[in-house]
């Protein structure tokens, strides 16, 4: 199969013109910025030669601090110090309050129900906080590179939905950045390893950061990067390890934090203990008047359920990719939390091989994003690399009977556009409602609604005569647009899917699993619904035919017989016996065959009345 070379928007017009571009890893705990210099992707350090910028913003009465300076204010002024804002972006206020009730911030709702954090500098949205972090990274980049940036590639977790992706782009625009592309974090890591280490074959990218977990199964071959399957958990990361240690300390000392400052101090101590346990067999935590020692074995026992949860997600991703674990040739470790020895040990046992850690797991995502940014601005015009991300959940449309017709199946590579034709259900129908859905189940009630719109202006026709073409298009950033067009008049309507908030953590992890758990029941429910829809169609057409021609073409006994069979089908349709409905449809079809033939003959006779044979032969 031939591969097409596709020029990306924003490429340099002149091949010799070098444009400044960077890759940004906008992380939950830390963020980094990288660029390609002299053909190599490198991390750009700040003025103190620090590569990691804590994803923290402090909004003081007189000044705003970003990064390490802000992090140092976390225990002193927690209400005005925003950390892990990536967990909040694209979420509703009720979702944030239910999921993160321990956060020290005061929240209010914006006009559209999104969370605003009350600070000394006024209410701040997660988009604004993220924008301040991006501004800091932009400043570091322009100071190091000595010029203005032409564009940036920003990485996001593979499981970020439309709302979270759009919010990330909005934050970048607020910071004055030209976003070339949003890139899935595991894909960026694979890109970095593919160029630096020359890996080919099936690769698993295990990405455990501060706040999110992602697993991607990729095929790398001759410069082509293809994501076969993805999985993830937007509420699993190193922060959760910290909270487990903190809870353990509370259990040991019987002392609970009484203030937000104490809570933040305890979390900081837990984080320091976790880092110590990476290299040492034990760590001492001094909390208030107590000192407790936690061993690496105790720590491993605490985090075991979370590590196991990540491996179950890996198992599902392998199944989606139709790949056995022994087929995986390499396992790439990404994210600072993969430094935990127990994580590396368990991942190695699961895949049956020692994970790759030759590139700093904290930096690999930013390095890969920088390579992609360099290509997108046209600095690497001879690149034959093709990078293919995927749709993580199927996208579909509601059809009659509450069924879901999948237009773009999950794990389809993006960007992608798919179209399908639909028709009207009733005679004279002049409008059609388009209900856009996301998920793997067969029924509308079991999937997530993304949006609705109505196509109006359909010419009145007989049921089934109109042709409405519905097109689903997902761009390179994973954002969806849907268009419906009536083919004869070209009248159309469309929608861009930008939900006001994202999936809850339970929904993200449960949607795919539920499709497996309920596969048999879903199939039976779909078949029953399809039979009911067919019964409705037959009933509707018979009623219309009886009203139009029954009195003229049928005897009284024939009319009553069809009515009786019709009522029997209407009754049996209310039940859940699929076979009985099918038999009822067949019985009504048999009962109306002679009636249908008479209607056809009457229609032909009417069309021929008053015409000569020559008129028919030579129209």
From Swiss-Prot:
Nucleotide-binding keyword on record: yes
InterPro entries documented for this protein: ATPase_NBD, Heat_shock_70_CS, HscA_NBD, HSP70_C_sf, HSP70_peptide-bd_sf, Hsp_70_fam, ISC_FeS_clus_asmbl_HscA
PROSITE patterns registered for this protein in UniProt: HSP70_1 (PS00297), HSP70_2 (PS00329), HSP70_3 (PS01036)
Record keyword Hydrolase present: no
Any GO molecular function: ATP binding
Top-level taxon in the UniProt lineage: Bacteria
GO BP annotations, alphabetical order: iron-sulfur cluster assembly
Keywords tagged on the record: ATP-binding, Chaperone, Nucleotide-binding
HAMAP family: HscA
Family: Belongs to the heat shock protein 70 family.
Function: Chaperone involved in the maturation of iron-sulfur cluster-containing proteins. Has a low intrinsic ATPase activity which is markedly stimulated by HscB.
Name the UniProt record assigns to this protein: Chaperone protein HscA homolog
Organism: Haemophilus influenzae (strain PittEE)
Gene: hscA
